[in-house]
Amino acid sequence: MITIKKQEIVKLEDVLHLYQAVGWTNYTNQPQMLERALSHSLAIYLALDGDTVVGLIRLVGDGFSSVLVQDLIVLPIYQRQGIGSALMKEALEDYKDAYQVQLVTEQTEKTLVFYRSMGFEILSTYNCIGMTWMNREK
């Protein structure tokens, strides 16, 4: 049975395998950055199968005006079982009073269908566009 738990402290060694399993090399090639990111997150929820971490959602932001879903990961063999939805629902419930919850994701049919099913809309719905700046030296 899968349980969802909000964690105050998340250790790198407990979740690095998730990032490796989905090929997020920006994190796996820079584990020190991920470790710092984990410790500075607004909230992290883990999906557990017994004692095994099989998924997580990581939020950043102030928790009131803006919350950003930075990471939502479920191990591939656990996907399509409602775990990602359960993680998202838990996070959205805890931050239901926030002005806005945002995320950036790959532009695929799979991700669009999933996030729309969770109530998210693309920014153009609000006559907005998203932008990002990345430090290309790192």
Task: Show where each model-derived region lies.
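Short amphipathic alpha-helix that is part of the acyltransferase structural core
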Residues: 1-28, 126-127
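A short helix-loop-beta-strand connector motif used in the catalytic cores of GNAT acetyltransferases and
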Residues: 35-46, 99-100
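Conserved beta-strand in the GNAT
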Residues: 46, 52-61, 65-68, 73
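Conserved acetyl-CoA-binding loop-helix of GNAT-fold acetyltransferases
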Residues: 74, 80-93
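Short glycine/proline-centered loop/turn elements that form peptide/ligand docking sites
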Residues: 88, 109-111, 130-134
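Conserved GNAT acetyl-CoA-binding A-motif
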Residues: 94-106
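Conserved active-site alpha-helix within GNAT-family acetyltransferase domains
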Residues: 107-128
